[in-house]
């Protein structure tokens, strides 16, 4: 069996969808426009340049606004094509829900892209940001989430300022407040209703859709809303139908089922005299984190064009069957817009690697269990073709358990325990070389042994801050070295962050057509491990990241790549300092410095050392929260 390269098993050709690739030297390159082959930059060279020019300290989050612009263009183009092929006469509006990533640079990049799109807010604070960024051009704004009177007034102000603002009714109690505040401002509100469907997508976010969803109105509540609006002579205000199946839908059949059910709501509302003009299918457009085109939780079994065609066709068929007008289709595809635009580059600060050690045979007077382990070890080379490979490992496991028991009651010394543990590793390593991946029965134990002997890479980042979904919901993200991808697989590794938490590990890695518990790696010097890239982290991760162990935001570089491959860092942020993080938890850095000074003054340190300590402590407060080289 030929040895595969890192490039072949990390699936970059699939999850990268043209934005990320590998050049002839084996370095990962970024291509903001997949059709412009010369518009590329090496991630390794970019990192080195930012370190040199901006004195950047790793980890650094690289963001590519051109990818955001291209994603807008691609999604708009897919729906334009689908509408043309279906003869669909209604419009289309791609809406960006800012909860996916509320950072100013993201919203401003989208607003300046020249691509048509709207904005969505799910809270009062988000609406304040949306109204500001909408600017002087008429912008379609969807207002979701639970609302108080202030939220409602802000939305109505947006309508008065010339925007097309839809207040989506999430619960019946909101409608009275909306009508009252609209009357005070002398404005006719644009209303939407979120229908709670029976249909539900599968996956990690399935609870956000379906009958048990946190949001939306049931069928009977929708009828009550219609009755209330009729009584108030405001039925014409209800113009938008909204539903949400769940985020990151992996199966295109779930999309088709949800669109079909919601189209029935559209038909029935028209029968009740409600002139629905906008059909908001919500989120759900998934991205393929795994790169294997399946319907798993972290993949999708459809393309962008298939998604658009499924949505447009489902709505158009209902309109055709019942002779209804084609509404404007709205999608809230935040993950599809932002996921690819950001990649975190981090350095490895330490490597723990298994190294076989030559051991001497136990002394004649050593306990019997040690001799039993030694017999297993010597038996491997003498009879490897005559016995089950598993039996050697099982014998070693039984003996090692006995060693631990005897050690705990004082029958074995620490040196004897250490000898036994090392010999057991030698046994497993030697037997592991004899297993064959082609044998289905061997695969489970091969995986177990790979995890046991994988290099442990201690990476200078916080999983909780930079990849919170990997910790919280077991989300898989593409991760691989950013150099050496044309080299054969020579090692396996597991990644551990620098927090003081045993949950700070990455447990799942892309491995060709499947998912493994270890990451394929090229051979590399233990003292010079490659930099690692964590890809597709542009959706939710920056916003959900938490301050575990007071690790803060990483440095961020916004990069624009020219057609000749030259790049410009248009914005650079150094990330949080230690003082920043302490202030978040109400620790005043000035007060801390005062207390340091008091302790030093009461010490017997020489004056020169006391002054040096104070300077170092002050520099520490102003330093990066992540580990720094001297």
Swiss-Prot record:
Known cofactor(s): Mg(2+); pyridoxal 5'-phosphate
Pathways per UniProt: Amine and polyamine biosynthesis; agmatine biosynthesis; agmatine from L-arginine: step 1/1
Highest taxon of source: Bacteria
Binding site for substrate: 279-289
UniProt catalytic activity: L-arginine + H(+) = agmatine + CO2
Annotated keywords: Decarboxylase, Lyase, Magnesium, Metal-binding, Polyamine biosynthesis, Putrescine biosynthesis, Pyridoxal phosphate, Spermidine biosynthesis
GO terms classed as biological process: arginine catabolic process; putrescine biosynthetic process from arginine; spermidine biosynthetic process
N6-(pyridoxal phosphate)lysine modification, residue list: 99
Record CDD domains: PLPDE_III_ADC
Cited InterPro entries: Ala_racemase/Decarboxylase_C (IPR009006), Arg_decarb_HB (IPR040634), Arg_decarbox_C (IPR041128), Arg_decrbxlase (IPR002985), De-COase2_CS (IPR022657), De-COase2_N (IPR022644), De-COase2_pyr-phos_BS (IPR022653), Orn/DAP/Arg_de-COase (IPR000183)
Job description of the protein: Catalyzes the biosynthesis of agmatine from arginine.
Entry similarity comment: Belongs to the Orn/Lys/Arg decarboxylase class-II family. SpeA subfamily.
Protein name stated in the entry: Biosynthetic arginine decarboxylase
């Amino acid at each position: 069996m030929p040895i595969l390269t890192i490039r072949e098993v990390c699936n970059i050709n699939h999850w990268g969808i043209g934005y990320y690739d590998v050049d002839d030297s084996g370095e990962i390159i970024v291509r903001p426009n997949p059709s412009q082959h010369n518009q590329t930059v090496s991630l390794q060279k970019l990192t080195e340049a930012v370190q040199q020019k901006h004195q950047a300290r790793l980890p650094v989050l690289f963001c590519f606004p051109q990818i955001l612009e291209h994603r807008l263009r691609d999604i708009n183009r897919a729906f334009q094509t689908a509408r043309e092929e279906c003869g669909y006469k209604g419009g289309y509006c791609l809406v960006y829900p800012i909860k996916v990533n509320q950072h100013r640079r993201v919203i401003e990049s989208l607003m300046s892209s020249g691509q048509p799109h709207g904005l969505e807010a799910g809270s009062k604070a988000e609406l304040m940001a949306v109204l500001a960024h909408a600017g002087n051009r008429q912008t379609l704004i969807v207002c979701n989430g639970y609302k108080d009177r202030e939220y409602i007034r802000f939305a109505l102000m947006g309508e008065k300022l010339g925007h097309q603002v839809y207040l989506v009714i999430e619960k019946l109690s909101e409608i009275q407040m909306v009508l009252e505040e609209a009357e005070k401002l002398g404005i006719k509100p644009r209303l939407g209703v979120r229908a709670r469907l029976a249909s539900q997508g599968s996956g990690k976010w399935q609870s956000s859709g379906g009958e048990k969803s946190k949001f939306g109105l049931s069928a009977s509540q929708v009828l009550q809303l219609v009755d209330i609006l009729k009584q108030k002579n405001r039925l014409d205000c209800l113009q938008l139908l909204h539903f949400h199946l769940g985020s990151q839908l992996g199966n295109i059949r779930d999309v088709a089922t949800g669109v079909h059910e919601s189209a029935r709501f559209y038909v029935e509302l028209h029968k009740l005299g409600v002139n629905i003009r906008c059909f908001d299918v919500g989120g759900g457009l998934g991205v393929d984190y795994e790169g294997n085109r399946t319907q798993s939780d972290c993949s999708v079994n459809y393309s962008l064009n298939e998604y658009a065609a499924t949505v447009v066709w489902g709505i158009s068929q209902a309109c055709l069957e019942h002779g209804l007008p084609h509404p404007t289709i709205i999608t809230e595809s935040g993950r599809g817009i932002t996921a690819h635009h950001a990649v975190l580059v981090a350095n490895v600060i330490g490597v723990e690697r298994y190294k076989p050690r030559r051991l001497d045979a136990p002394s004649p007077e050593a306990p019997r269990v040690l001799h039993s382990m030694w017999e297993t070890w010597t038996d491997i080379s003498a009879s490897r073709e005559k016995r089950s490979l598993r039996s050697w490992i099982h014998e070693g496991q039984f003996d090692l358990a006995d060693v631990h028991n005897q050690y705990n009651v004082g029958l074995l010394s620490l040196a004897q325990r250490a000898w036994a543990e090392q010999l057991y590793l030698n046994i497993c390593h030697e037997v592991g070389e004899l297993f064959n991946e082609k044998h289905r029965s061997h695969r489970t134990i091969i995986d177990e042994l790979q995890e046991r002997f994988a290099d442990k890479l201690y990476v200078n980042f916080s999983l909780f801050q930079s990849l919170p979904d990997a910790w919280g919901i077991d989300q898989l993200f593409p991760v691989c070295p950013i150099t050496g991808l044309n080299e054969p697989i020579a090692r396996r590794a597991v990644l551990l962050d620098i927090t003081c938490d045993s949950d700070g590990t990455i447990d799942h890695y892309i491995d060709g057509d499947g998912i493994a518990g270890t990451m394929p790696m090229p051979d590399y010097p233990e003292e010079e491990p490659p930099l690692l890239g964590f890809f597709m982290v542009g959706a939710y991760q920056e916003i959900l990241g938490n301050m575990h162990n007071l690790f803060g935001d990483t440095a961020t570089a916004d990069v624009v790549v020219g057609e000749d491959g030259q790049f410009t860092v248009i914005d650079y942020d150094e990330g949080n300092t230690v003082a920043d993080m302490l202030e978040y938890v109400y620790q005043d850095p000035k007060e801390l410095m005062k207390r340091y000074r008091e302790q030093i003054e009461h010490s017997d340190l020489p004056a020169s050392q006391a002054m040096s300590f104070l300077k170092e402590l002050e520099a520490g407060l102003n330093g990066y929260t992540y580990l720094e080289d001297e």
